[in-house]
Amino acid sequence: MNVIEKLNSIQNKEMTAKENVENFIKVIDEKNEELNIFLEVNKESALKQAEAIDEKIANGEKVGFLSGLVFGIKANINVEDYIISAASKTLDNYFGSYNATVIDKILAQDGIILGITNMDEFAAGSSTETSCFGPTQNPAAPGRIPGGSSGGSAAAVAAEMCDIALGSDTGGSIRNPASHCGVVGFKPTYGAVSRQGLLDLSMSLDQIGPLSNDTSGIALALNAISDYDETECTTLHGKRPDFTSALEEKSLEGMKIAVCKEFIDVTDAEINVAVNKAIHKLVEAGAELVEVSFDNIDLCLPTYYLINYVEFFSATRKYDGRDYGYRIEDVCGEEVLRRIEIGSYISQKEYSGKFYKKALQARSLIRDEINAMLENVDLIVGPTVPKLPHKIGDELTPMEMYAYDVLTVIANLAGIPAGSIKAGEVDGIPVGLQIQAKPLDDLKIIKAMSVFENEN
């Protein structure tokens, strides 16, 4: 059953929330040591939450619209009384003293927090190999990376260790692992979801979002976490839609979708074959297909990383070892140190105008071109990641690693929503279809993904 069917089953007393938690705990007990997905699991707390929900249902009391659904949370999102390490030695003794806004919203709707998932150290990576706790295995492609930086969250869903997981997406960190693990991942419009309680990698790019095995889980999670937050300055005012309303859609009649030639050109041929078949399903469902060009694709990666380096350097200055943990430069991994050192260099007064300000100008060009493209179409569709996940332990240069991000950083630079859903497989390895829309058209992506699932 899909996530919303399970929710209905719990609310209709066909299964209990406690049974749901126990089923996931059993899988974690059997597989987590091998897969290294959850860094911390609080079985007692999760079972206690579940029993309270079951009691309310038995007594005919009102329950939330996530009642009994189980969540895994990325290790850079604050959850009270859990170790929130961002998978770094720097924070290995930092206990969350409060809940991030998204956690409070999940709990308010009777969602159950089961534990904390692995990730790339400080979200700086695309493979979940840089974690100080060791790499996470890909349940859908054994021996290969799950993607990153939210690799533990994607793997938790793929391994059926939770119903829904939360991740953060700076340049594809939800969509990249969703593609590699064959699950659904969603990066909302920038500002649609509060970032209060997130350990930032890059303030102007980061966004919290959900991962699940089907679109109904994404829609339910968005209904809970997408809202204005007066404590977080980047959240947007305005009423959010009911994302579950799109799950009833059966057709894409009247929707125009665009394929970008440049996205195809940078993607491996066998991935394009799988993605093209998926796009054809959208056309069969009634969508009109057009081809567009994106002139600024070569600007995207250098622009993204220049901004990322500077904002990451600024964000990590608070990890100086005085209040908790260690000084970050003394204990961090190679990729985190690289970003700090480059960010420090670019941030110097004599270089800021030469690099950072030009990156901001390039970002404006990218945003303007994407938004102009989306004025004439409803959605942009194409590959999520241009190449297959490498084998764990393979040595890649930094530029080879960054190449995973070329198609996903665009949404972060432009602030637009984007989702990834399994398009198919190449030699048994999942590949994703990425769907992007203009700002605040998140619902259109949910609709397209739901119709695609029904077509399959």
Curated annotation (Swiss-Prot):
Main enzyme class: ligase
Residues annotated as the enzyme's active site: 74 (charge relay system), 149 (charge relay system), 173 (acyl-ester intermediate)
UniProt GO cellular component terms: glutamyl-tRNA(Gln) amidotransferase complex
EC number: 6.3.5.7
GO biological process: translation
Pfam families, alphabetized: Amidase
Gene3D superfamilies: Amidase signature (AS) domain (3.90.1300.10)
UniProt keyword list: ATP-binding, Ligase, Nucleotide-binding, Protein biosynthesis
Reaction catalysis annotation: L-glutamyl-tRNA(Gln) + L-glutamine + ATP + H2O = L-glutaminyl-tRNA(Gln) + L-glutamate + ADP + phosphate + H(+)
Listed GO MF terms: ATP binding; glutaminyl-tRNA synthase (glutamine-hydrolyzing) activity
Subunit structure: Heterotrimer of A, B and C subunits.
NCBIfam families in the cross-refs: gatA (TIGR00132)
Described function: Allows the formation of correctly charged Gln-tRNA(Gln) through the transamidation of misacylated Glu-tRNA(Gln) in organisms which lack glutaminyl-tRNA synthetase. The reaction takes place in the presence of glutamine and ATP through an activated gamma-phospho-Glu-tRNA(Gln).
HAMAP family: GatA (MF_00120)
Family: Belongs to the amidase family. GatA subfamily.
Protein name: Glutamyl-tRNA(Gln) amidotransferase subunit A
Species of origin: Methanobrevibacter smithii (strain ATCC 35061 / DSM 861 / OCM 144 / PS)
